Design a protein with these regions (language model features):
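Catalytic core of pol beta-like nucleotidyltransferases
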Residues: 1-24, 32-39, 48-98
Length: 98
């Protein structure tokens, strides 16, 4: 179950960078912590540098293509205290490499 969720998260992260212009994608939450994971656990991703205009459409596309609920948050809108938690506990899945 964990391997499947991690694989899906990596696929989503790569798609966000390549197709939607994200600069960095960080996995956080239960999948990143690898505990209390259930079959229906959502995938939590913090995304930096992605344009805000199409944000909700992109979330919907990810849900449709992956078949799993995705909680996508824009890095730029997070409070500093939550950014610190994501940086400390999260896993960097993809970045644009520039």
């Amino acid at each position: 179950m964990l391997n499947a969720a991690m694989r899906e998260a990596r696929q989503m992260a790569k798609r966000l960078v390549k197709q939607h212009g994200a600069k960095r994608v960080i996995l956080f939450g239960s999948v990143a912590r690898q505990r209390r994971l259930r079959r229906d656990s959502d995938i939590d991703l913090a995304v930096e540098g992605m344009p805000a205009e199409n944000f909700y459409q992109i979330v919907g596309d990810l849900w449709t293509k992956q078949g799993r609920q995705v909680d996508l948050v824009r890095w730029e809108t997070l409070r500093e205290s939550f950014r610190q938690v994501v940086e400390r506990e999260g896993k960097l899945l993809a970045y644009d490499g520039r």
